Regions:
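N-terminal secretory signal peptides that target proteins for export/translocation
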Residues: 1-18
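Bacterial N-terminal signal peptides
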Residues: 19-34
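Expand to "…catalyze enediolate/carbanion chemistry for C-C bond making/breaking, isomerization
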Residues: 38-321
Length: 321
């Protein structure tokens, strides 16, 4: 025989539970039902870890190399850095080796642990041709799957504009960022394989940041001459330029006719930094010691090229983890 008291208690419990479910549904649905109240949307994931950090206002640290061995590729993939660039200007121009190096940096264990397709370390490259002669190497580099290109010897706005165009696909009609009009040819099968996305997805990601806030390619222009310093504002203001880059400054000192370490060189460095800040693009420099690294970061440089020991020690001086 059914116990009426027990039946009443069960019914009360059931009714109470249903009220909680309905209330929870109302609370969860409230943002959708409230007129004029936008629903927060998750930001799209940048597949370029350097851009992901720069977009958040962080400093990024990296290396350069001429060693394109698979052994070093595996080492770099787990190094405590954000990028590495292959220096193919002062080392043999070897695209098959560059391709294998990028494949060697593909760390499936890290991808699985991270839970998304963003690598820990981005790969850029620097090539022999000057900026206005670089279309063919840029096409090769991006179709291999690189995350960005460092252009040598950018002296004028025209050279900067051409560099940008070589990295962009032609845009769809009606695009708000149609210009600068891209001239990159379509054929990124190797890149899509390494990025782990479809061709359509790759075309959405393969645009220049910060011109396209969702872009994952970075155009970095090296200032290496007095002429480049004279045209800094015109170069830095070119839409699509992501960063200005200074190496150790040897070519710049040669152009100035002075020795490394001369005061004129540092004045030139500071002009580059000021132009980057004025036009809200990233600014890259080389640091040879931990103290130099800390000094440059405090000045506002947000892309630092050095070595792992210097980066580790410099970040410790800055109180960074």
């Amino acid at each position: 025989m059914l116990n009426p008291l027990r039946h009443s208690s069960l019914r009360s419990f059931h009714d109470g539970l249903m009220r909680l479910v309905v209330l929870a549904g109302i609370v969860l649905a409230a943002p959708l039902l409230t007129p004029g109240r936008p629903v927060a949307q998750q930001k799209p994931l940048h597949l370029n870890p350097v851009i992901a950090k720069l977009a958040e206002g962080k400093t990024v640290y990296g290396l350069n190399t001429g060693d394109l061995s698979l052994v070093y590729a595996r080492e770099v993939a787990r190094a405590p850095v954000d990028f590495i660039y292959a220096d193919l200007e002062h080392n043999p121009l070897d695209f098959p080796a560059l391709h294998m190096f990028l494949m060697g940096m593909t760390d499936k264990a890290t991808i699985l642990k991270k839970g998304n397709l963003q690598p820990n370390v981005a790969l850029f490259a620097r090539f022999p041709p000057e900026a206005d002669q670089s279309q063919w190497v840029v096409k090769q580099a991006l179709d291999i799957g690189l995350h960005g290109v460092i252009f040598n010897g950018v002296d004028t706005k025209e050279q900067a504009l051409f560099a940008v165009k070589t990295m962009r696909y032609p845009q769809l009609k009606g695009s708000k960022i149609y210009q600068p009009a891209g001239i990159r040819g379509a054929g990124p099968a190797n890149a899509t394989w390494l990025w782990g996305i479809s061709g359509d997805e790759y075309e959405r990601h393969a645009d220049l940041w910060p011109l396209n806030p969702e872009g994952d390619l970075l155009a970095m222009l090296m200032i290496e001459s007095v002429e480049g310093l004279e045209n800094l504002d015109a170069i830095a203001s070119t839409p699509g330029v992501g960063a200005l880059f200074l190496g150790v400054g040897n070519d710049l000192t040669h152009s100035m006719g002075v020795r490394p370490g001369s005061p004129e060189v540092e004045v030139g460095f500071q002009k580059v930094l000021s132009a980057c800040k004025a036009h809200k693009i990233a600014c890259a420099i080389t640091a040879n010691t931990a103290n130099d690294l800390a000094k440059r970061v405090k000045e506002g440089w947000n892309i630092i090229r050095s070595t792992v020991p210097v980066i580790t020690a410099g970040r410790a001086l800055l109180g960074e983890r």
